[in-house]
Amino acid sequence: MDTQRFVITMNGDNISFIVGDNAINHLSEEAGKYDSIVIMISKTVEEMYANHIPDVGSFGNSVVKISLNDGESLKSLRNYQKIVKVLLERKVDRRSLLVYIGGGTVGDLAGFVASTYKRGVMMIAVPTTLLAQVDSSIGGKNGLDFSDVKNVIGTFYNPYMVIDDTVFLKNNSFIIREGMSEVIKYAIISGGDMYDTLNRCSIDNFDACATNIIKLSVKIKSEIVNRDFYDRTGIRSVLNLGHTIAHGIEGATKGSISHGKAVATGMLVEAHIGEKYGNTNHEVIEAIRDLMKRYGIEELNLKEIGPGNILRYISNDKKIMEGYINMPVPSEIGKVITMKATERMISDGINTFIKENDAS
C-alpha cells in the first residue's frame, strides 16, 4: 500500500505525518536537508531491521549515531547527561536535526534531549511500535524518571515530522495487540469512523487496515490534545480511559503484565464501575469485550492478581483527592464522562468484573 501524507496542527506547530509501508524511505530525503544530524536509535530495532533502515551515513556531512537499550531504565538523568556530553564533544549545534528510531522509551528520552539541548533542535520521530505510533509520539509529552517516579521531569515538544512505517509491525502480533488496546480506547471515546473501522478489520487482516487505523488514531488523539495541550484543564484526561485500573494492575504485578493488556482490562473494569453506578450502558461493556476478542487481547484474571493488591496501588495514585478519584468512564460508544469514584466504588467494580467472569 502507498504511503499517506497529511499535516496536523498541534499547539501552533504544523506536523507532517507519513504513514504506510516503507514510509522510512522518506527519511533520507528529509535528513539530507541538514548538515548535522543526530540519530538516536533502539539497538533492538537496529539489529532486527538492519536491511530496512536507510544507511545513516548517507544522511549528511556530519552524523552522530547513538544506539540505545530499550526499556524504562533508559529514561534517566544519567543517560540524558551522557548524550548531551556526546553532542557537545561532537560540536552539535542548534541548527542540527535529531531523529529517533524506536519505541516509546526511546521517544521519551529523545524528545527531552531535542527540547532542551541548545534550547531546542528540530526533531523527526520514527516510532517503531504500534503503541508509539498511535499514542506516545502524538501530543508533545516526553519525560525522564527520577527517584522512582515516572516522567517527573519532562517538557512538551512536538517533532516537525512523524514517520509511521507499518513494516515494523508486520509479523509481530505482540506489538499489534499492545497498540490495539489504545486504539480500542480511541474507538470507545470517539465512536464513528474508528469504531466502524475496527469492526470491519481484525488481527487477521491487520496489515491491510494498519495505515487507516494509525491515521484515524493520530487525528482523534490530536483533536483531544489540541484542546488541552499542556494538560492543565482536565480535557486531556479522557485519554486516561482504562488507565486508572491499568496502573493498579501494573503496580500489583510489578510490571509483569504488559501495558496493553492492563489498559484493555482496565477499560472493561471501569465500564463495569460506570454501569454499576448508573453511568454506563451495558452495550459499551460488550463492545469493548468484542473488540478485545477481535484483536486477540485476552482478559486478565484479576482474581489471581488480587483485588486488594490492585486497589492498594490505585489508592496511592497521585490523582486521588478528598477520598475520590476523577476517573473517565464510557457512558456510551462515542461519549466518555468523568466520574468521582471512591475506593469502595472501584472495589465494587473490580469484584463485579471478577464475578461476571467466574460465571461465564
From Swiss-Prot:
Residues at which NAD(+) binds: D70, G71, E72, S73, L74, K75, T128, T129, K141, K150
GO cellular component labels: cytoplasm
Catalytic activity: 7-phospho-2-dehydro-3-deoxy-D-arabino-heptonate = 3-dehydroquinate + phosphate
GO molecular function: 3-dehydroquinate synthase activity; metal ion binding; nucleotide binding
Pathway noted in the entry: Metabolic intermediate biosynthesis; chorismate biosynthesis; chorismate from D-erythrose 4-phosphate and phosphoenolpyruvate: step 2/7
Location in or out of the cell: Cytoplasm
Keyword DNA-binding tagged: no
Cofactor comment: Binds 1 divalent metal cation per subunit. Can use either Co(2+) or Zn(2+).
Keywords: Amino-acid biosynthesis, Aromatic amino acid biosynthesis, Cobalt, Cytoplasm, Lyase, Metal-binding, NAD, Nucleotide-binding, Zinc
Record family assignment: Belongs to the sugar phosphate cyclases superfamily. Dehydroquinate synthase family.
PANTHER family for this protein: 3-DEHYDROQUINATE SYNTHASE
Its job: Catalyzes the conversion of 3-deoxy-D-arabino-heptulosonate 7-phosphate (DAHP) to dehydroquinate (DHQ).
The protein's name: 3-dehydroquinate synthase
Native source organism of the sequence: Thermoplasma volcanium (strain ATCC 51530 / DSM 4299 / JCM 9571 / NBRC 15438 / GSS1)
Source lineage: Archaea, Methanobacteriati, Thermoplasmatota, Thermoplasmata, Thermoplasmatales
Gene it is expressed from: aroB
